[in-house]
Amino acid sequence: MITSALATTVVARTALARTVTAAAAVAPADPVAARSQMGFSLGWHIIVACLGVGMPALVLFVEWRGQRTGDVYYRLLARRWARALGVLFAVGAVSGTIVSFELGVLWSGLMDHYGAVIGLPFTIEGFAFFIEAIFLGIYLYGWDRLSPRAHLLSGVPVVIAGILSAAFVVSANAWLNSPQGYTVRGGRLVGVDPWSAILNPATGPEATHMLLSAFMVTGFLMASVYAVAMLRGRRDRYHQLPSRLPDTMLADL
């Protein structure tokens, strides 16, 4: 069974390579420039994307602690971090749109041949993005307008949608490393199973790595901001409290 599975994987990867090679006519004229542009765009987007995944959970946790303990500093931090989250979400939406356009323009051969296989995760990611945007708007607008409990609950879909959005996008990248969910006959794709493509062997490790990295990036960045402030002499509770919260998140991870 193991030998058969390995053989199937090798055949699938060989078929992928052949089809991509056959699509060379629509490949970028300068692959090095195309790769450089894609790498630069992704390098910028991934930083904002990590914050977009990890920061909602941190903001929601701080607000929950504020409601539970009655500490006004928690509420103040949650409100200010939420504003920063709104800006980061807008920047991430723009940078993510650029990456998606580059994927279709620079590597149109891949998408033309395999769009039916890996199109579903991008579609689901789009739905998750809109859900995240809608509830983030409610969350930001709902300060002092919704009850504390309703406002806290309005942030839950933001956290869930952000995690799902990242996981489904990563599954498309994982499929490139472990392609499955289709059969090539006569140079054409038949028997396409998008869910099999999404749930390929590389999706679990890559998605786990991505999500943990997102929370770690968020924790380290938030802790460093207030650590710098404390080094400059601001050692009041407002600066001490947030410097400990990200450390707690990192310790849990």
Regions found by a protein language model. Give the residues of each.
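Polytopic transmembrane helical bundles with strong interfacial aromatic enrichment
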Residues: 2-5, 10-253
